[in-house]
Amino acid sequence: MSEVNAGEICYVKKQRKGTINPNKICQPIGAMWATVGVKGTIPFVQGSQGCTTYVRYAFNRHFREPVSIATASFHEHAA
């Protein structure tokens, strides 16, 4: 670690040896990944649309084809 002084702001600069991939530590993504691997199934997310959109985007980038994921589309007004 090294201390860097930028005018009046002083911060510590850290050097990391690795990176954390959120896709590898996210349990819902793991469950959806397992469901996509079973023929004739569609993953269902009982949550917000944003969570499903992120997973769709990640899967589309990985598989390079559209992936269907169903969602309940919950939002704060439904509570």
From Swiss-Prot:
One of the Pfam families matching this protein, by short name: Oxidored_nitro
Described function: This molybdenum-iron protein is part of the nitrogenase complex that catalyzes the key enzymatic reactions in nitrogen fixation.
Reactions accelerated catalytically: N2 + 8 reduced [2Fe-2S]-[ferredoxin] + 16 ATP + 16 H2O = H2 + 8 oxidized [2Fe-2S]-[ferredoxin] + 2 NH4(+) + 16 ADP + 16 phosphate + 6 H(+)
InterPro entries to which the protein is assigned, alphabetical: ChlB/BchB/BchZ, Nase/OxRdtase_comp1
Major enzyme class: oxidoreductase
Family the UniProt entry places it in: Belongs to the NifD/NifK/NifE/NifN family.
Gene from which this protein is expressed: nifK
GO MF annotations in UniProt: ATP binding; iron-sulfur cluster binding; metal ion binding; nitrogenase activity
Cofactor note as given: Binds 1 [8Fe-7S] cluster per heterodimer.
EC number: 1.18.6.1
Required co-factors: [8Fe-7S] cluster
Protein name: Nitrogenase molybdenum-iron protein beta chain
Listed GO biological process terms: nitrogen fixation
Quaternary structure (record): Tetramer of two alpha and two beta chains. Forms complex with the iron protein (nitrogenase component 2).
Binding sites annotated in the UniProt record for [8Fe-7S] cluster: 26, 51
UniProt keyword annotations, A-Z: ATP-binding, Iron, Iron-sulfur, Metal-binding, Nitrogen fixation, Nucleotide-binding, Oxidoreductase
